[in-house]
Amino acid sequence: MTIIVTGAAGFIGSNIVKGLNERGETNIIAVDNLTRAEKFNNLVDCEIADYLDKTDFVARFARGDFGNVRAVFHEGACSDTMETDGRYMMENNYRYTLALLEACLEQGAQFLYASSAATYGASTMFREDRDYEKPLNVYGYSKFLFDQVVRRRLPSAHSQIVGFRYFNVYGPREFHKGRMASVAFHHFNQFRAEGTVKLFGEYNGYAPGTQSRDFVSVEDVVKVNLYFLDHPEKSGIFNLGTGRSQPFNDIAVSVVNALRESEGKPALSLDEMVQEGLVEYVKFPDALRGKYQCFTQSDVSRLRGAGYSDQFLTVQEGVSRYCKWLLERSA
């Protein structure tokens, strides 16, 4: 049976393709928009059966052109939270996804899609509940609105629908994301170029570098996606984070020590890094005041309740692995 991955040349999509390959799955149709041609690099070491542009895909899928489709992993979207073209965002993230959902329901294909923690916006509670969903930008709203459709459709759906609210994902194959790439990726490049990592200073009662996020490795994101592929009887909207919040200081320390280890140098503590100028704190930008979340932490109770029991990588574990991967490819 065929598996389809949209956004297949992107960050999470290409990691899902690779994860499927590692399970012996190669009958995969990759769907994407390669206007930014460099994204093809994410698929060079992957095995796929075919590639389609996103503009051609939904209509062909709805016609049944691909035969017996087991599942669709829908990772394709505009993920730039700074995008201000609301018409583009809603057409690309909401309307396109809605058409794909309808086709999956019609054909009985499993539908596993990327939602986002951006649906919570200004909330201080990160639980899959309408009361806590307060998106702050049109990206978050596009994801939020589709999640509401899913909630209405789930009671009558005869095939799986699963939405994953990704928190701060980092890991291999994100080179093309530019400013939207993870903090770990930016710290890696900054330290190699400048010999220091810069973090925000004190803000809103948080000491320098202690603003924190639920950072989740793309390795874990893939594992959760594949768990639900194996359990088509499980549907719903689930947070996909670690359930832990770790400070940006932890990312910086993990990156610096991974790079020091590659040079045969001993690990240092945060205080030692600050003393040696390897970690620096800069004034919190005025432009971000009042618009910046100092804390996120996913509530993973619903995910655990669905039977997913694997432990998530810590920042120290995941970032160290990621830096080694980056070093291997930049040698």
Curated annotation (Swiss-Prot):
NADP(+) binds at residues 11-12, 32-33, 39, 54, 75-79, 92, 143, 169, 177. The active site is at 139 (proton acceptor), 177 (proton acceptor). Binds 1 NADP(+) per subunit. Gene3D superfamilies: NAD(P)-binding Rossmann-like Domain, UDP-galactose 4-epimerase, domain 1. InterPro entries: Epimerase_deHydtase, Heptose_epim, NAD(P)-bd_dom_sf. It is an enzyme of class 5 (isomerase). Its EC number is 5.1.3.20. It comes from the Bacteria. SUPFAM superfamilies: NAD(P)-binding Rossmann-fold domains. Homopentamer. This is ADP-L-glycero-D-manno-heptose-6-epimerase. It comes from Cupriavidus metallidurans (strain ATCC 43123 / DSM 2839 / NBRC 102507 / CH34). The gene is hldD.
